[in-house]
């Protein structure tokens, strides 16, 4: 906006702060007028040391949507949250010296589940069959994830909790390869997705 407003134009609200309560409320009002039932927000996990400013904005958004009871669900920014390449999100790789990316994934999901199940005024989190819903960005590029999903399911069951996952796998590539890094057959890949996700979506619809 500052460099070339004639080309990029100017937002209706002007150059704004997306953590401003009035800005959040205005966007929700517009969404309601357009018949939009909920917002998906970017979530970078629980590492506040790495993502402090983003976490502050996210938490403010969650509080405000709670006040006016507007439905929301997180889009887990998998490569950023797990400090992995977006092309190969290997859950067995180290996140910390003694913590794998898969371990951090479990920690993040359990933290969200606790927030969505147990905190006061958490009814505005979108749910499917009473399970808070989470979208996983670039699920198609995950590697070595199965054992961590199994461990997460066990941990959630022990807490009498559940999560409903949506997978970003839809791409211009062949449907025979929904999990781009997997060596399993297409049938096995789709079976794994069906066992761990309730829906699929496409974040980016483009290809080389």
Question: Where are the language model's segments positioned?
Answer:
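Glycan-processing catalytic domains of CAZymes
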Residues: 1-208
């Amino acid at each position: 906006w500052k460099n070339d407003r004639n080309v990029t134009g100017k937002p209706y609200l002007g150059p704004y702060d997306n953590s401003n309560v009035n800005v959040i409320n205005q966007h929700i009002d517009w969404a309601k007028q357009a018949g939009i039932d909920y917002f998906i927000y970017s979530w970078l996990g629980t590492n506040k040391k790495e993502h402090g400013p983003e976490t502050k904005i996210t938490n403010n958004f969650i509080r405000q949507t709670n006040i006016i009871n507007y439905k929301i669900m997180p889009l887990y920014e998998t490569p950023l949250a797990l400090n992995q390449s977006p092309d190969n999100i290997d859950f067995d790789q180290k996140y910390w010296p003694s913590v794998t990316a898969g371990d951090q994934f479990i920690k993040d999901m359990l933290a969200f589940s606790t927030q969505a199940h147990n905190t006061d005024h958490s009814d505005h989190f979108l749910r499917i069959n009473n399970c808070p819903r989470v979208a996983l960005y670039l699920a198609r590029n995950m590697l070595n994830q199965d054992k961590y999903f199994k461990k997460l399911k066990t941990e959630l069951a022990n807490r009498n909790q559940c999560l409903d996952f949506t997978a970003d796998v839809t791409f211009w590539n062949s449907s025979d390869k929904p999990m781009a890094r997997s060596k399993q057959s297409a049938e096995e890949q789709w079976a794994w997705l069906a066992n761990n996700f309730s829906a699929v979506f496409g974040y980016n619809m483009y290809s080389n």
